[in-house]
């Protein structure tokens, strides 16, 4: 243990979750115990500074008893937002309190990045049979390369929120990230270049899945090796220790096992997340290969996809809340599942044939999930039912905060998904890459049209924003809860959520665009 460990424990996340009332290792204590296997993503001197940081206060109602602390180093290592936020907590809070800047950063930056990515003209040529083909190497390095880089960044930021890093400490995060990215492109090109598999979109999606799962395997294998060696040493040496030393060794080993168990559950959630990713891509290919669909089939698709993602969201939230005790990870994974759910439903709009179908899909998905369910679940009646069924020890104040957090995440996902859908509907219908995306061609022989899709989707977005605004007013008046204010406090307390929000948004949006491209090399 380092000399500053006791001081750090009082400064850094005394409890990782605001809604956990039992004793658990702090996130920094776990990072300290895991350090031998997985080094921390930030320099140690930035995490242990007794004079600069004040103790973390716990949430207790609409107001904090005292100002929350801010780690100026936390959002900055290797991340350009350092130059925007600076190193002062007051400046950081001021930026987040600005409605325009906050929403530009969290809800506009990711869609703009993805729209620019898919708008770049892809070099093409016609073969002797008149088939339009893509230049393979441009596609590999630029199109798939950026897609792969964002996926690796998203996985890396999740590890950072957990205060560990999957990269070898000798190489460092940046060098390892670049080398692994180049290696994944090299292996991918060798696998698909000489086979017909490269024409299949799902092949590239599978390669992306493998690229993201390898860091998880690396980190878990390192941790398992450390755990096995440490357990063997403990059992061998325990009998030789003095009674007092033996007691301390037992306590430290118990702490290590807790940290190992929590990290193992974190890995399980990552695997569930990647499973949703691969299932979503498969369902997209299945849905597109069986067009056209009736209103009934479209609604069944929406509900089946909603049920699948919601179930995975529920399981992941339960694991993160009860096993890893990380509020920040719960929030980030909720955004992933909500955005995955909504953005796939948005793309369904391009195959709806009448305004009536838009209304049915909207009632089945967005309005119900954004307004009706949040208002019902925040009531004290539902809270009491939740306590009765789950035996939760959370107070109503903490429960209300969690429900408000869920609603805020839904709003972010709604705006990001719809802004992106409207943007790439325009770009992929009128832009130079339109031949590669027949899904947005909207030929005159088809019952659906670009005009109906664009204007009906805009009307849907307006209705969602109105419903969201009314829901916020009801929460403020009847539940004494300020959605935006609590979100700002969360970001101040967990700054790493900001770059992770951006990374996960870009990754999910790219998943959808990539799944509908028509590949001919």
UniProtKB/Swiss-Prot annotation:
Enumerate the subcellular locations listed in this protein's record, separating them with semicolons.
Answer: Membrane
> Where does the sequence pass through the membrane?
103-123, 136-156, 177-197, 200-220, 259-279, 299-319, 327-346, 358-378, 411-431, 450-470
The GO molecular function terms of this record are: transmembrane transporter activity
Keywords annotated in UniProt: Membrane, Transmembrane, Transmembrane helix
Q: Where is the signal peptide?
A: none
Bilayer topology reads:
Multi-pass membrane protein
GO CC annotation, single: membrane
PANTHER family reported for this sequence: PTHR40467, PTHR40467:SF1
Question: What is the name of the protein in this document?
Answer: Uncharacterized protein C553.12c
What is the species listed in this Swiss-Prot or TrEMBL entry?
Schizosaccharomyces pombe (strain 972 / ATCC 24843)
